[in-house]
């Protein structure tokens, strides 16, 4: 497992709701936390590690063993209040930062790995992180929420990411979109089918 970088196909995939949690998925979630800590992040969404599943992990403390590890499965955001502009970055767009307007407060409802429903009212940085990670599940990146001027300012960096990915694909070191689509379909088949 690795953190995918822009413009990888799966980053733009609209994730499917999870209907099944098993030991293998729990292990993948543990790996997501490990990757997040290695990259000094506070959140990581399934799409960012090539899992097309509606789930993300968060720990506002950044460091393993500190803070609280939270898993959000099939999150639903509501009661967004107020607006606040703030600087954001993303583990899938390393070393790029930009101003994004987000709601100051948000209510989130989700499930944990035990299938228990929980909810929370968040504000400040926690609200921003939850909105950022939830966007990933819809194939939306923070750069999509920036002003036109902000996007233009980082256009050169984005083009470098695009050229690097094209080069990897040309060298056969990155799968084609069709190969990725097949793998995505396998994940969806395994974890997103209605219970019988």
What are these regions (language model features)?
Residues 1-196:
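Positively charged
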């Amino acid at each position: 497992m690795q953190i995918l970088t822009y413009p990888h196909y799966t980053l733009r995939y609209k994730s499917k709701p999870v209907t099944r949690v098993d030991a293998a998925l729990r292990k993948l979630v543990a790996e997501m936390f490990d990757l997040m800590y290695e990259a000094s992040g506070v959140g990581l969404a399934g799409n960012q590690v090539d899992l097309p599943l509606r789930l993300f992990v968060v720990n506002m403390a950044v460091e393993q063993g500190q803070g609280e590890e939270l898993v959000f499965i099939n999150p639903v955001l509501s009661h967004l209040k107020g607006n606040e502009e703030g600087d954001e970055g993303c583990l899938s767009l390393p070393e790029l930062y930009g101003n994004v307007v987000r709601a100051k407060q948000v209510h989130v409802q989700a499930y944990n790995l035990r299938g228990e429903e929980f909810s929370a009212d968040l504000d400040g940085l926690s609200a921003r992180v939850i909105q950022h990670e939830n966007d990933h599940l819809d194939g939306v990146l923070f750069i999509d929420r920036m002003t036109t001027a902000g996007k233009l300012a980082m256009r050169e960096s984005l083009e470098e990411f695009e050229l690097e990915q094209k080069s990897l694909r040309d060298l056969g070191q990155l799968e084609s979109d069709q190969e990725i689509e097949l793998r995505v379909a396998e994940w969806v088949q395994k974890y997103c089918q209605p219970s019988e």
